[in-house]
Amino acid sequence: MILMPFLLLMQSSDAETYDTLLRCAAFHTIEAERLVRDEGAAAGDAQNATANDFTQTARAMLSEDNDANAVETDLAQRKAEYLDTLAKGEVNEVAAQWTALELACKELYPMLSRINADSISGESR
């Protein structure tokens, strides 16, 4: 009986982590698009690479029975939410959300490093 609430807690945490990964990917994708628009094609490369890392990590969290397009669909939804908020011109809200998001993304960087290291060591075997 004690195991069930623990499992539910773990699922919630995984869902929150998945959502944060996608929000970070959306954030970096939008930043890449802005940099490309403002500074040229190569300027967004680092942001796109970071967005890809977050997206790949989110994809790795999904079980194999999930739709292959689930991550892309979820990512597009998060990105649309951010772009809608930006379009409304709610600058203070965007700044507050993105400051919180930037902190959340920074907390996930160690996980990205571990996953990347594991995948690299798995490829070299």
What does each of the following model-derived ranges do?
Residues P5-L7, T29-I30, P110:
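Residue-level marker of positions within ordered structural domains that often coincide
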Residues M1-Q11:
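Sec-dependent N-terminal signal peptides
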Residues Q47-R125:
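Compact alpha-helical subdomains of small soluble proteins
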